[in-house]
UniProtKB/Swiss-Prot annotation:
<dbReference type="GO" id="GO:0015935">
    <property type="term" value="C:small ribosomal subunit"/>
</dbReference>
<protein>
    <recommendedName>
        <fullName>Small ribosomal subunit protein uS5</fullName>
    </recommendedName>
</protein>
<dbReference type="GO" id="GO:0006412">
    <property type="term" value="P:translation"/>
</dbReference>
<dbReference type="InterPro" id="IPR005324">
    <property type="entry name" value="Ribosomal_uS5_C"/>
</dbReference>
<dbReference type="GO" id="GO:0019843">
    <property type="term" value="F:rRNA binding"/>
</dbReference>
<feature type="domain" description="S5 DRBM">
    <location>
        <begin position="14"/>
        <end position="77"/>
    </location>
</feature>
<dbReference type="InterPro" id="IPR014721">
    <property type="entry name" value="Ribsml_uS5_D2-typ_fold_subgr"/>
</dbReference>
<dbReference type="GO" id="GO:0003735">
    <property type="term" value="F:structural constituent of ribosome"/>
</dbReference>
<dbReference type="InterPro" id="IPR005712">
    <property type="entry name" value="Ribosomal_uS5_bac-type"/>
</dbReference>
<keyword id="KW-0689">Ribosomal protein</keyword>
<dbReference type="Pfam" id="PF00333">
    <property type="entry name" value="Ribosomal_S5"/>
</dbReference>
<comment type="subunit">
    <text>Part of the 30S ribosomal subunit. Contacts proteins S4 and S8.</text>
</comment>
<keyword id="KW-0699">rRNA-binding</keyword>
<comment type="function">
    <text>With S4 and S12 plays an important role in translational accuracy.</text>
</comment>
<comment type="function">
    <text>Located at the back of the 30S subunit body where it stabilizes the conformation of the head with respect to the body.</text>
</comment>
<keyword id="KW-0694">RNA-binding</keyword>
<dbReference type="InterPro" id="IPR013810">
    <property type="entry name" value="Ribosomal_uS5_N"/>
</dbReference>
Length: 177
């Protein structure tokens, strides 16, 4: 099962999405033992996102474990006022490579599967994205999160370089700003 509809948690005002549920088996002396693995993403639609991978004998337990792990592994993403990326970014995790670039207002989220779920819960509305290599949902999620972690806002760049924000904005292009 891949990419189910969103569920909203009223406890923390977080948006939760289930990406995949896999049935896995372990062969033992008496036959096979089945268990389930769930991959989920959680975000506040305002620049915070986390993902979790949970395993259990029953599907609801696996999903619950994944959601708990996702809530504990949340990171902050610097968003543009136009709800898009600050700049083009590349994310790599094992065999999965993803490329994301900012899009103009009204474009929407042009991305597939697991990447789309992350971008929706983080609060990005306009982005163009492409996955290369491995399309394994776990690798795509990790590559996307790695890319989002490495994104820098103009304020962060100015502070790191010891320059003024005006200097950075005038001499470098940050999504048309």
């Amino acid at each position: 099962m891949r990419y189910s509809n969103k569920q909203t948690s009223n406890i923390h005002e977080l948006q939760e999405k289930l990406i995949t549920v896999n049935r896995v088996s372990k062969t033992v002396k008496g036959g096979r033992v089945f268990s389930f693995a769930a991959l989920t993403v959680v975000g506040n639609v305002n620049g915070r996102v986390g993902f979790g991978y949970g395993k259990a004998r029953e599907v609801p337990s696996a999903i619950q474990k994944a959601m708990e792990k996702a809530r504990h592994n949340m990171i902050d993403i610097p968003l543009n006022p136009g709800r898009t990326l600050q700049h083009s970014i590349i994310g790599i995790y094992t065999g999965a490579r993803i490329y994301m670039k900012p899009a103009s207002e009204g474009t929407g989220i042009i991305a597939g599967g697991a990447m789309r779920a992350i971008l929706e819960v983080v609060g990005i509305h306009n982005v163009l994205a492409k996955a290369y290599g491995s399309t394994n949902p776990i690798n795509i999620v990790r590559a996307t999160v790695n890319a989002l972690k490495n994104m820098k806002s103009p304020e962060m760049v100015a502070e790191k370089r010891g320059k003024s924000l005006e200097y950075i904005l005038n001499n470098y292009t940050y999504n048309g700003r």
